[in-house]
Amino acid sequence: MIGLRPAFSTMLFLLLLTGGVYPLLTTALGQWWFPWQANGSLIHKDNVIRGSALIGQSFTAAGYFHGRPSATADTPYNPLASGGSNLAASNPELDAQIQARVAALRAANPQASSAVPVELATASASGLDNNLTPGAAAWQIPRVAAARQLPVEQVAQLVAEYTHRPLARFLGQPVVNIVELNLALDALQGHRAK
């Protein structure tokens, strides 16, 4: 019985430390130092949560920039079902999906003369990606400008304005957050696109 007391005391101490003190401390520090990130990087417009800067949304109207395809089953951009399609590059089903996406993108973007950007035809590993390269966003500018009856230059300027560059140039590539960009388009015109 004497040998159990130190083991039980150690277990109780570690349980309180790792199950109570550590989670409370990390939560408090996160809320103190990084409150926006710790609360999900939520985007607020007119005191309403419009989305998260970390999770993509399904934009299908011609007046919006479209993000990467979602690989989440049943409901696009479902954060509870995050994950890729798990189809191998050699799988004919993946090839058929990509070909169908390319055909749909070409039909929706008849003004685009260059090749369809890869990230518009392929889903990300999480299936929830909210960022595109500036090139993939630029590829969609003619469609969005025509649908919103805006000058192409004005939409291109908005894409440039919402292009986020990495802190150090060698640590990544510039990206455009599609959720933020589409909300900025709505704010520019004062309404939602049809």
UniProtKB/Swiss-Prot annotation:
GO terms for molecular function: ATP binding; P-type potassium transmembrane transporter activity. It is a single-pass membrane protein. It is found in: Cell inner membrane. GO terms for biological process: potassium ion transmembrane transport. The chain crosses the membrane at residues 12-34. InterPro entries: KdpC. Keywords: ATP-binding, Cell inner membrane, Cell membrane, Ion transport, Membrane, Nucleotide-binding, Potassium, Potassium transport, Transmembrane, Transmembrane helix, Transport. GO terms for cellular component: plasma membrane. Belongs to the KdpC family. The system is composed of three essential subunits: KdpA, KdpB and KdpC. Part of the high-affinity ATP-driven potassium transport (or Kdp) system, which catalyzes the hydrolysis of ATP coupled with the electrogenic transport of potassium into the cytoplasm. This subunit acts as a catalytic chaperone that increases the ATP-binding affinity of the ATP-hydrolyzing subunit KdpB by the formation of a transient KdpB/KdpC/ATP ternary complex. This is Potassium-transporting ATPase KdpC subunit. It comes from Salmonella typhimurium (strain LT2 / SGSC1412 / ATCC 700720). The lineage of its organism: Bacteria, Pseudomonadati, Pseudomonadota, Gammaproteobacteria, Enterobacterales. The gene is kdpC.
